[in-house]
């Protein structure tokens, strides 16, 4: 204590010296030196300011801190305090800690020095906020006052609860405080809102309308459970009032009682999630049938059953849509039919959409199709399309049988190879490993089936699959044709829209009947054809013999000409009579082989070639050779030889040559030419017939030639005609050529020349006819 008194005395002396006159004051440097010495000796304890120009004692610093705390309202930041007092922050912090340790009313928190009076003032402000808003959250206070949450909760709110702060802590959230009046006010809002709601309402909507906190709403809903219930206690949940549930139940009962059914969609719109359970709960005494999207009562089911029984009994039809509510869809009606159609009823009825037709009623509708079936079957046989179908099916069967045989052979070869490779005792391979091919068979496919029209059976083979072709098929009657007949029967009943469905149903049945009928007609036609074929065979044989003899006789006439003319006459003879013979044989073979013979007569070269190539193996080589001979033969004998062989292949006999009959044939040929000449007026044809008549009489042979060969024939006849006759014929021939040349011209001069030539020909024609008609071979007596 004496030291401190001494220090005080020295300080007083120091101050006195400072305030004395200049001669008695110490300099600033001396003062600093004195203070330094005092500090070194430990006689004083002072604190420097930040700029080093001032000194403070600890007590004075404490007092300065308290003064600043008071001035700032009981809360001061240590950093701000160090700046204001111009003292190092560490000294300020140290001083603040000492003050807090000695004074329980002070708090050091987050670098701030806080006095209890400040906390009391905050408590009063918080209470005012509660009075104003009714609710407050510690988190909001933390943001407002920049203080830790726990400090505000424990040191301010809880410490002053029921003293300065009059509120109630939320039991579900310790950081929320509210007043009792606030709770009562919100509950009144909620009660009024819930009482006004008559349909399911989202919790979020109630929260938005009432502006009530969600926790208070959920707390109130639990207390007001008599008004309604909540699906989920979250904004995504819904509040369902009990009055709405009662309305739902009553609506479902009334609707079902009136209509006998109820749609799921309708009940779902009422806000019911589990429709089936809800409806079953509301109608416990009803026998309900659960369908895909509706529930049907037993009353409607019984009504449909009674109508169905009446329909079957009367052999008529029933439109289900006329006895069921219009609100039911086609799928609903189909489900009802599935429910009521017993196996017995199914055998007697067919269902097309919403219409049920009895079997007897449908049979009456398609009676008119039986005549159509017979007509189409007859047409198919007459046109040959059914025969083509039979032939294709036969070929297909042969391919199948061949494929099966090849497969069996392959299986046997594989089996023998397998036995050889795994044979007894160690022999042929000298104990070495022998490689063998895999004997695994590939799976047979299901395509390429062959069907039999008689029994409808199917054969599946691997061979048909390899061919890759479809089964032979013929359609004798179409569903469209059946529909036209059925529509006439259904139209009076107003059911014409079912014609297509009924036709599609009966199409396979009537198609099979048509095939059976076609097969019967085909068998009958085969029997008739066998009889006609024998007659046809004899007729064609006679015709071919006639053509053969004519060609043979004409050959004698053309051989009298020079070689160059012979070639032309031979070509013309084969082109006419030879072609006729070849055509007859081709048509006969086509008929025998069931080939398509719908060709325009006469046959063309391509048609003859096609028939020859498509014919059977017993006919093909001979017919192909004959067709080639028409253009390739150099002599008549060659063509006749091939014709004879082809006739033998067709089982036709060639009659022996009778020379007596040859003379009669030549005579008949001459009389035929004379008759034509008598009735002919065309100059070119008159000349043609006249030279043929003279040639036949003079050579006693027949000649087949065209108009272009007249000149060559006239040259040949120069030796048998008199000079005058030859001159007449040459002149007549020249006039004919001139007339033919002028006919192609349209000039007036050409027309005048044509008239003049025609006039001259008219004068010479009787002369030419007279010469030909009266011509006699020298030394020969005419035969009548």
Curated annotation (Swiss-Prot):
**Principal EC category:** transferase
Give the keywords, sorted. Answer: Transferase, Ubl conjugation pathway
Source domain of life? Eukaryota
GO terms for cellular component: endoplasmic reticulum membrane
- A Gene Ontology MF term for this entry? UFM1 transferase activity
- InterPro entries according to UniProt: Ufl1, Ufl1-like_C, Ufl1_dom, Ufl1_N
Query: Do the record's keywords include Transferase?
Result: yes
Q: Its Gene Ontology biological processes?
A: protein ufmylation; response to endoplasmic reticulum stress; reticulophagy
Q: Which family does it belong to?
A: Belongs to the UFL1 family.
Q: What's its job?
A: E3 UFM1-protein ligase that mediates ufmylation of target proteins.
Q: What is this protein called?
A: E3 UFM1-protein ligase 1 homolog
Q: What species is this protein from?
A: Anopheles gambiae (African malaria mosquito)
